[in-house]
Amino acid sequence: MKKYTILFGAICAIILAFSLNAKADFTSTLSFSNLPPGNPGPYGTVDVSLTGQTATITFTAAAGYFFGDGSSAAVELNTDSFTEAFVSESPSNNFKAFAFDQQVDGFGSFDLAVDQKNFAVKLTSITFTVTNTGTAWASDADVLAVNANGFDAAAHVFSTSSGLTGFAAETPGEHHIPDGGATATLLGLGLAGVAGIRARFGRN
């Protein structure tokens, strides 16, 4: 009986690990830029948190950089049908409009972009939501996809050290692959295994 208790505990630990992984936000690091030399990355991060079929996407600038102007935040989405909504910006709102299928200099076209009025307000964070009305997302990692140039997100950045602006995205070769429900499937298999063990040995 002792060995089954240990096995049961091990499976529970695995399930907990998978469940924590499923709840963890997906993050893309903006570490590659067309800024001139002397403006090293990282330039910021893109955090994706999924609740139901609504993804909250937050761009956060790294120290020494800010977001602003056109294509201040842009994402490629793993869906053909969605609705978008502005949430907030820091230190103050400078939001102008959303743009669709917008070209970001050096990084290709993105499904959705956030345009600011200008660089008058240098933003440290931009948050918006995307609600999927197409094929369901299985996890946070399912929300973004890579565009034709191989990037899932990009931003228009301002360097405080040089006073120059440019665009940034994740480093080439660090692109993610949508989860496609694999985590949920493994979690389900783990739960089924626990149920089987309890049914077989629960009364002993």
Question: Model-predicted segments: where are they?
Answer:
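Bacterial N-terminal signal peptides that target proteins for export
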Residues: 1-8
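Ser/Thr-centric signal marking residues that sit
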Residues: 5, 54-58, 183
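Serine/threonine-rich, low-complexity intrinsically disordered segments
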Residues: 7, 167, 173, 185-187
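Bacterial N-terminal signal peptides
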Residues: 9-17
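Sec/Tat signal peptide C-region and signal peptidase I cleavage site
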Residues: 18-24
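Mature extracellular "passenger" or substrate-interacting domains of secreted, surface-exposed proteins
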Residues: 25-176
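A short, hydrophobic C-terminal helix/tail in secreted or cell-surface proteins
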Residues: 178-198
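Short, charged juxtamembrane terminal tails flanking transmembrane helices
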Residues: 200-204
